[in-house]
Amino acid sequence: MTAERKLIVLDVDSTLTQDEGIDLLARYVSDEAAREVSNITALAMAGKLDFAASLTARVQALAGLSLDDVVSATAHVRLSVGAETLVHSAQAAGHLVAAVSGGFHEMIDPLAAALGLDMHRANRLEARDGLLTGKINGPIIDAQAKRTSLREWAAQHDIAPANTVAVGDGGNDVLMLSAAGVGIAYMAKEITRAAADVIIDTPDLSLVLDEIGVPRV
């Protein structure tokens, strides 16, 4: 890659973070719901289920959870090793770092603010009277939406497609990785690895810097 300005777009669940946010939320419903949601998540990330349909089914299981439960679950989200180094080093070199997720703004907004991400996009949980309805508010952020976000942000900031980098682990990241100048599969499922230009199998997100020639700070 060149020394020109880059756009790095990260998946969130199991990439920027070590956890699947919806699985953390499901634990506040019941052990049975947590197992069911976790199983559906695993199949969706392996590309064996349609993401939008699987997300709709999983979110339905969250109906009745309070927004306070969402805040509590968010407190348990763990950043991936090397996440802060990746973001801060890339930005120090003049690049942009964004995140796009099939997860939820309610959980990702605090992380994006803490990391100082340049842009982020995710689904929104519908709530009424402080309780989740079990529905998504607005269009679903799926594989196509992730690819669109990468292209849209690059165009907005006059960054050539060849200077875009996408990092993800699951089946719904494949289109985004394929559209990027460099697609990086991070601790990824087989379907994602097959679509990637670079594969990182060590749980350290800062290794992305080495692959794109950006020094650590």
Q: What does each model-identified segment do?
A:
Residues 1-125, 203:
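Alpha-helical substrate-recognition element adjacent to the catalytic core
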